[in-house]
Amino acid sequence: MASNQQSYKAGETRGKAQEKTGQAMGTMRDKAEEGRDKTSQTAQTAQQKAHETAQSAKDKTSQTAQAAQQKAHETAQSAKEKTSQTAQTAQQKAHETTQAAKEKTSQAGDKAREAKDKAGSYLSETGEAIKNKAQDAAQYTKETAQGAAQYTKETAEAGRDKTGGFLSQTGEHVKQMAMGAADAVKHTFGMATEEEDKEHYPGSTTTTTATTRTTDPTHQTYQRK
């Protein structure tokens, strides 16, 4: 009897142990399955998160690239417009400078021609005046010389009946005539002093050429007024 009871208890204990082992195995399988499911979900979640992160980064990169491209295009366009404006301004400035230089050159040419014309006119007038004075002086000298020769001739003829004292007086008179001719030439060219002009041409303010002749039986005088 005791053996049967022991066997029954041993079987019951073994059955309980098997049942517990089966339950433990089932629990372990459930936990393993649950862990596998969680791992799968975690992996899927991580994969989804990585995909979303990559897509977001891709979108941001694309947006950044587009913004940079747009900015570069705007910068290039702005630089192009500024370069064009600068070139136009420089061209306009160069044109204005060239035009101003042309106008100044033209004005300088006009002034040079005007100065040349004035100088030519002045030289022409001066040359004509000198020529006239020289002609007047030559004419006066010629007339004076002719008068002196005539006077000398007449004096020589009259000297035949005169004394030596009269001949001496005649020689002095000829000397004075020669000096008068020299003073007249100086006066003609404006080289005479104011005192000489007053002495030889009293009351005269302009240069005039004239020859007068006074004749008396014993004396002849030639004077330039």
Curated annotation (Swiss-Prot):
Compositionally biased tracts (Basic and acidic residues): 28-39, 49-61, 71-83, 93-119, 154-163
Q: Which GO terms describe its biological process?
A: response to cold
Quick one: where is this thing mainly located?
cytoplasm
Q: Which GO terms describe its cellular component?
A: cytosol; nucleus
Location(s), subcellular: Cytoplasm, Cytosol
Where do the TM regions start and end? none
Q: What drives induction of this protein's expression?
A: Transiently up-regulated during prolonged dark.
Q: Where is the composition biased (Polar residues)?
A: 141-153
Question: Which intervals carry biased composition (Low complexity)?
Answer: 205-225
User: Which keywords, in A-to-Z order, does the entry hold?
Assistant: Cytoplasm, Repeat, Stress response
The keyword NAD appears for this protein? no
Where are the residues of the annotated region Disordered?
A: 1-167, 193-225
Which ranges does the UniProt record give for the LEA 11-mer repeat repeats?
53-63, 75-85, 97-107
Q: Which family does it belong to?
A: Belongs to the LEA type 4 family.
- Protein role: Involved dehydration tolerance.
Protein name according to UniProt: Late embryogenesis abundant protein 29
- Gene name per UniProt: LEA29
